[in-house]
Each structure stands twice: as structure tokens, then as C-alpha cells.
Curated annotation (Swiss-Prot):
This is Large ribosomal subunit protein uL15. Keywords: Ribonucleoprotein, Ribosomal protein, RNA-binding, rRNA-binding. Residues 25-37 have a biased composition (Gly residues). The keyword Ribonucleoprotein applies. Belongs to the universal ribosomal protein uL15 family. One of its GO terms (molecular function) is rRNA binding. Gene3D superfamilies: 3.100.10.10. The keyword Ribonucleoprotein applies. Residues 1-57 are annotated as: Disordered. Binds to the 23S rRNA. One of its GO terms (cellular component) is cytosolic large ribosomal subunit.
Amino acid sequence: MTSTLNTLKSNSGSRKKKLRKGRGIAAGQGASCGFGMRGQKSRSGRPTRPGFEGGQMPLYRRVPKLKHFEIINQKNFSIINLDKLKDFNDNDTVNLDSLVKKGLIFKPKFPLKILGNGKVNVKLTVQAHAFTKVAKQKIEDAGGSCELLNNK
């Protein structure tokens, strides 16, 4: 048998009738409409908003406003700008140990990062754990080299 438009039928159970609540007890959802006897949840205009706790001070208002969350796995660096490297001579190697000896870094607690503020007039070999783009460019323009050390 071929199917034509006038013989098409939807599958059984695919089209469900909408429940009409509050239209008499014979309909099965009359009177209290399946919402129970009394109380806020049975009234019109339901439901209550998400997070409503029945008038009790809600959790989002009981908890204090937290600010300044710490960054998880934050990378801390001992930073130094290029203008501090003017004490070094031509062809010197700049690393964390040489900066401590010159007194430019006092406590070498973190890995070294070179920032690009200032000028470099001498040819230096700089060994650090991180460089900014500007710092790396200025060191290489002065004829020096940047060696990237691995972070531990």
C-alpha cells in the first residue's frame, strides 16, 4: 500500500494531550490540581524562584562577599628591568647569581624574569627563566643573547 498525505498518521504516544488543571474533579486534575492541600506551593503564581528557602535568609546572602581570590598555581618571579643591567660590562653573563653578587636582587627566592623598561648599551648574555618580548628584542638589538632556563 502506498502512503498518501490523507492516510498519514502519527505514531501512537508521540502526541500527548496537555493536562487541563482545575477543570472539575472528573478530569482527574481538578480541585487542588495535584498541588496538595494548602501552602505556598499550592497557590497561584507558583513556583518560587530558584534559591528561595521559604523566607529563611538564603545561602547566597549568609555567605560573606569574598574578594581577592588567590590565583591557583600562580607563577612568582624575581623581576628586574633592563635599566638595572647598566652595571655590567661588555660580554658579561647576567643570571640570578651575578645579580645577587651585584646587590640588584637580595633574596633569590623565585625564578628570574627580565622586564623591558630601560635601555641596554652593552653586549650581554642574559640567562633567565622568562623574558618580556620588549626585553628580549632590546637585548638582541644591542648584540646580546637571551638564554631561556627551564622553570623548576
